[in-house]
Amino acid sequence: MLTNSKYHDFEEKIVKVVNPETVGLDSNILKNIRTYLDETYVKDGKYVGTLTLVARKGEIAYLDSLGYMDRENERPMQEDAIFRIYSMTKSVTSIAIMQLLEKSKFRLDDPVHWYIPQFKDMGVFQAGVYPNFVTSKPKRHMTIKDLLTHMSGLTYNFMYRTNIDAAHRSSDVMRAENLEDFIDTLSKIPLEFSPGDKWNYSVSTDVLGYLVEKLSGQKLDEYFQEHIFEPLGMIDTGFNCPEEKKSRLASLYEHNPLGKPNLMEV
């Protein structure tokens, strides 16, 4: 049996990468990943850089960096690079709320306004523009399950489809400095539809984050750290990147109309 494992020295821990064959993978096939990414994306300038990890049976079998983490300063992609995960935070928030469900802190069918009173009188949009709306009473109250399934009637400011999307841009809802202000402003904007009627990608998970705070008695970042990140050994995950780790923080890019990455200022 092949056992020639490799050890990668990261800044805060040693990461073991086993021989792929020991976990039922093929080394030669895995090598094709680098070739494909390089020829299809990196050389063509579609991606600035990539970092790939393949794991099986609890073991890391493939770890490879390619291109740059900072194109402008020609900093090669590091194997321990830190990335902004943005909406992947939703999965962490959903885990947190389900942990609290396991502790019987709430039921999935509980109305949200039991825990967030400001949501009790939210109407459904009928006509008007921000801040003057005509609304109707929803068919039923929004539940915590609606938040988890994005069927709450809420929306996002970047959708550019409806007057409610526009209201999210015109109001200060996405510029709120804390969850309390976010919830207070959000509660004054009508719902796009009655909860449960449709699916719509939205700020529902942000509301769940506020519920985590209300139900646990902890700030969201503290809850994540104590109940998710520390137990899983996620030493590089958080809402802010500490000063001592910023050298590992990859620059952020977005695609321009030509499909090429442009540096974003954040």
Language-model regions: role of each:
Residues 2-30:
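Short, compositionally biased leader-like segments
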Residues 2-4, 10-11, 122-266:
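Short, surface-exposed loop or secondary-structure junction motifs
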Residues 16-20, 68-70, 111, 115-118, ...:
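Short linear capping/connector segments at secondary-structure termini
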Residues 21-85, 105-107, 121-128, 133:
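Short, conserved catalytic-motif segment at the N-terminal edge
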Residues 29, 115, 223-227:
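Extended, well-ordered alpha-helical scaffold segments
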Residues 31-38, 52, 58, 84-112, ...:
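Active-site SXXK
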Residues 42, 101-102, 187:
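Alpha-helix C-terminal capping/helix-coil junction sites
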Residues 64, 110, 218:
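Short beta-to-alpha loop/turn elements within the nucleotide-binding domains of ABC transporters
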